[in-house]
Design a protein with these regions (language model features):
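Glycine-rich phosphate-binding loop and adjacent beta-alpha segment
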Residues: 182, 195-201, 206, 237-303, ...
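Cysteine-cluster motifs in flexible loop/terminal segments that predominantly coordinate metals
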Residues: 16, 64-124
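Mid-domain Rossmann-like dinucleotide-binding core that forms the NAD(H)/NADP(H) cofactor-binding site
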Residues: 114-115, 122-214, 218
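Glycine- and charged-residue-rich phosphate/anionic-cofactor binding loop of Rossmann-like
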Residues: 284-287, 299-322
Length: 345
């Protein structure tokens, strides 16, 4: 192993909706090992790597899936998600944990395995004391929640927030919003999300709405005294255009921000731009997270303010990866929200 690299023993690899989408698509760029939400212990650390990163063997770390170039403008801002060197969506040769082919040496690029290779440009965070590896495995969706709700959406003290979709991303947006002092948080879902909506209540949601059995807009306006919401966080990938339209209508008369999760592929040929501009709304696309968001996420998780165990529903060994991915996609274990692969289980 090079002196400027390290080896990480994977303790936890989270499973998310992106894994479901990736699993269904044809391979790009050769065979690969999936798993991009990784926590583990540094089992071997080169001297140069240790000096540069300030870590040592035995440290428990959360590993971001980005492997940036280290010298572009985005990297200098801690916005590794925008670095071209790790932009797998447009360049199959870009290196990113969970997406890069095993054909690229040394091949240890996916967390659904026992070990990961960490070159000098790996981005890692020490896990705070008192936080278990499995709890730290929630850091990716929590980072997204903090990025989308607080940093991108501007949620803060006394905000009124609408979160559409009570999956792991939506629930983390909820926790981030409540932690930041939001006054009222409304969470919407469908009838199949009944258990997730109950978890949302336990996490502090002030109002939960089943959009299939209730008039969602009427409930939102009733619960906000007709004012509407300040921020809409749309976490409903694959739900079509209805959530976007609801978000526009539910936003207050003037101003307001709507953040739409950026993994959706649905077309919107008749987007009501006039309704958006007449309200002076800001529309943003949410995708990934910044370095700062991860640091804040680990700090929040370590506070143990929320009953995370309600969201951490299932764990599987490596033999159960197929079932775990299908479960996140709604075709496996019932009641699945956040699932983790424990490679040594």
């Amino acid at each position: 192993m090079p002196d400027d690299a390290a080896l990480m023993k994977v303790e936890v690899a989270g499973v998310c909706g992106t894994d479901v989408s990736q699993y269904r698509l044809p391979l790009r760029g050769g065979p690969l090992v999936m798993g991009h939400e990784n926590v583990g212990y540094l089992s071997r650390v080169g001297a140069t790597f240790a000096a540069h990163k300030g870590v040592k063997e035995g440290d428990l770390v959360f590993l971001e899936h980005y492997l940036p170039c280290g010298h572009c403008e985005w990297d200098h801002m801690g916005e590794y998600r925008h670095c071209a060197a790790t932009e797998w969506f447009y360049d199959p040769k870009a290196i990113r944990y969970g997406y890069t082919s095993t054909d690229i040496a040394p091949g240890l690029w996916g967390g659904f395995s026992h070990y990961l290779y960490l070159p000098l440009n790996a981005v890692l965070h020490r896990v705070p004391k008192g936080l278990t590896a499995e709890e730290a495995g929630v850091a990716t969706p929590m980072s997204n929640g903090i990025q989308w709700a607080l940093i991108d959406g501007g949620v803060g003290y006394a905000s009124t927030v609408l979160i559409q979709g009570p999956g792991q991303q939506g629930l983390c947006c909820l926790m981030a919003s409540k932690h930041a002092g939001a006054d009222r948080v409304i969470v919407t879902g469908t009838s199949k999300d009944a258990r997730r909506l109950e978890v949302a209540k336990a996490f502090g949601a002030d109002v939960v709405i089943d959009v299939e059995t209730e008039d969602a807009l009427a409930r939102i306006m009733e619960s906000t005294d007709g004012r509407g919401v300040d921020v809409v966080l749309d976490c409903t990938v694959g739900a079509g255009t209805a959530p976007t339209l609801l978000g526009i209508e539910a936003t207050k008369r003037r101003g307001g921000t709507m953040v739409v999760q950026g993994e959706g592929n649905q077309e919107f040929p008749s987007f009501p731009i006039g309704r958006l501009t007449r309200k002076g709304m800001t529309l943003k696309s949410a995708r990934g997270h910044s370095y700062r968001a991860v640091e804040l996420a680990l700090h929040q998780l370590a506070s143990h303010r929320f009953p995370l165990e309600l969201m951490m529903t299932h764990t599987f060994g490596l033999a159960g990866v197929d079932y775990a991915i299908k479960s996140v996609g709604g075709q496996g274990a019932p009641g699945a929200i956040h699932l983790s692969v424990l490679p040594w289980k």
